[in-house]
Regions:
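Charged catalytic carboxylate motif
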Residues: 51, 192, 242
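AMP-binding/adenylate-forming catalytic core of the ANL superfamily
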Residues: 238-250
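Hydrophobic side chains in well-ordered alpha-helices
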Residues: 55, 207, 243-246
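Acidic, Mg2+-coordinating active-site environments of NTP-dependent enzymes
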Residues: 62, 86-232
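Conserved phosphate/oxyanion-binding catalytic-loop motifs
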Residues: 235
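Glycine-rich, charged/polar anion/phosphate-binding loops
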Residues: 74-77, 157, 244-247
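Short, conserved glycine- and acidic-residue-centered signature motifs
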Residues: 45-48, 186, 239
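Phosphate-binding loop of NTP-binding sites
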Residues: 1-129, 133-142, 173, 197
Length: 250
């Protein structure tokens, strides 16, 4: 997955989802790297090529069937993922970030788009239609394009039926599912996860049941209950868009 916000939550929950569904999986993320159930600390969102390929080799030897990975714009630009063949590429959203490195938003967008330009023909390019750059990302890809949206007609859709501090009731495509996650941005993350599971051939009912058991990724809108029923929210938000999403949710 690539995008400004939502990468860590999406890959972490995909890893947990497919583990729950009975698959042996790997995870390469901002928070941690996992080979099956064996975890190690991560240094960068997208590690250097030697580290990535070493971990992928460990995953193969451990019998992992899937690896869910965050792909940063810097990682793409520096060719840290060169030579890797992705089965699925997901685009979450694009807002201002890393402009200290890329200098311009156009260059930031170009690096994100390059990830999809390089996907093979037998891959899937999953994109958020509600982001103004969603279709730009996949306009030159050779992969099969699959869309998701909370606002318009798409291959996979979602609507928030109810929400509170305890979670949300979502209508995912034509079926309802409860989740302990909160906030519209998490509805987008869960829809991207659901869409990915569907293109990878997972059973829809089993997927929705498993999604309802998934807790937030560490430091991603975690709701902690304090004394006297006081709620404490822990969140990593460090971009204007991410902070706005958190404050709107609260």
């Amino acid at each position: 997955i690539t995008g400004t916000n939502g990468k860590t939550t999406t890959v972490t929950l995909l890893y947990r989802l497919f583990t729950t569904l009975g698959y042996s999986c790997g995870l390469l993320s901002t928070i941690a790297n996992y080979v099956g159930t064996k975890g190690s600390e991560a240094v960068n969102t997208t590690s250097d090529p030697l580290t990535i390929n070493s971990l992928l080799s460990e995953m193969v030897n451990a019998g992992c069937e899937y690896c869910f990975m965050e792909v940063s714009s810097i990682g793409v630009e520096q060719e840290r993922i060169a030579g890797l063949k992705f089965k699925v590429g997901i685009f979450s959203n694009l807002t201002h970030d890393h402009l200290d490195y890329h200098k311009t938003f156009a260059e930031y967008l170009r690096c994100k788009k390059l990830f999809f330009d390089q996907l093979p023909q037998d891959a899937y390019a999953i994109t958020n239609m509600d982001d103004r750059n969603g279709m730009v990302m996949v306009q030159n890809t050779k992969a099969k394009v699959v869309t998701y949206s909370l606002r318009s007609i798409a291959d996979h859709t979602c609507r928030i039926v109810e929400q509170s501090f305890e979670g949300m009731l979502l209508r995912m495509d034509s079926r309802e599912s409860w989740t302990p996650l909160i906030g519209q941005h998490n509805a987008y993350n869960l829809l991207a996860i659901h869409t990915t599971a569907m293109v990878l051939g997972a059973d829809e009912e089993e997927t929705l049941i498993a999604l309802s058991t998934l807790r937030p990724a560490p430091g991603r809108l975690e709701n902690m209950r304090g004394p006297k029923d006081i709620s404490v929210i822990i969140d990593y938000a460090h971009t204007p868009d991410a902070l706005e999403n958190v404050l709107k949710t609260l």
